[in-house]
From Swiss-Prot:
Protein name, per record: Serine/threonine-protein phosphatase Pgam5, mitochondrial
PANTHER family referenced in this protein's UniProt entry, alphabetically: PHOSPHOGLYCERATE MUTASE-RELATED (PTHR20935), SERINE_THREONINE-PROTEIN PHOSPHATASE PGAM5, MITOCHONDRIAL (PTHR20935:SF0)
Family as reported in the entry's similarity comment: Belongs to the phosphoglycerate mutase family. BPG-dependent PGAM subfamily.
SUPFAM superfamilies on file: Phosphoglycerate mutase-like (SSF53254)
Gene that specifies this protein: Pgam5
The protein's role, per its UniProt record: Displays phosphatase activity for serine/threonine residues, and dephosphorylates and activates Pk92B kinase. Has apparently no phosphoglycerate mutase activity.
Pfam family, any one: His_Phos_1
Source organism superkingdom: Eukaryota
InterPro entries: His_Pase_superF_clade-1 (IPR013078), His_PPase_superfam (IPR029033), Mito_Ser/Thr_phosphatase (IPR051021)
SMART domains noted in UniProt: PGAM
Lineage: Eukaryota, Metazoa, Ecdysozoa, Arthropoda, Hexapoda
Amino acid sequence: MRKLTSFVCGTGAGFAAYYLQRLRDPQAAVHNSWTNSDKPVDPWALWDTNWDCREPRALVRPLRNSQPEEENRYNAELEKAKAKKARHIILVRHGEYLDVGDSDDTHHLTDRGRKQAEFTGKRLSELGIKWDKIVASTMVRAQETSDIILKQIEFEKEKVVNCAFLREGAPIPPQPPVGHWKPEASQFLRDGSRIEAAFRRYFHRAYPDQEKESYTLIVGHGNVIRYFVCRALQFPAEGWLRISINHASITWLTISPSGNVSIKYLGDSGFMPPELLTNRIPRDVKNVV
């Protein structure tokens, strides 16, 4: 009986301490609704159906009245504004490169970086994709990666779109911040608006007249790709630096006709041998493969 009383008292004291802690620090509470409720806890968890400003209801003139003729007009225009097919956007990070000198002209791929790009090109060829569009950043390392990939897939080099908006940069101050990388606020302002403009240029649901699924290949940079992933999935964009992707890795996002976005690959590099898996700039130039 004495043991039972001791157990009950101890348990009660534990619950009391837990309850008092909850009152003092409500942010530390674990919400059961995170796991068993269909109602999101935080507003940002709600999906914005008009994220690309192409939601049919946002493009069509609203109903003016409830007359059958007006409803028929509205429904016809609504149907005409709807996308019919999905868009697939495949993002490839450039291969490993040498960060030698201040000019981008000196930032060429290493031997290992070229091998990485070759493996990526072979992988894309194996997927048997018929590319509708290929876009590459204008930075040297992305251009060289794109050129190597083009040797493996069926696409005319003259049709590649070179886009300065895709150049590497600082998209948005990351959370949590890191001590080893602290660009000036002016750089975030300059790069962030450019990278966001690139996102809006390439990420949107299909146009209504698109009759088949489309495939766009974008050869770019780690920061830009990670920011794109967060924006496309409507995750907090400040979390982009929590993601790590390897050199020449493949990230695949699909935008459905409804505007919903899903991710198929994130930084996939499993098709490369282990010795080619890298994600940082080599510091010792002499030891570069």
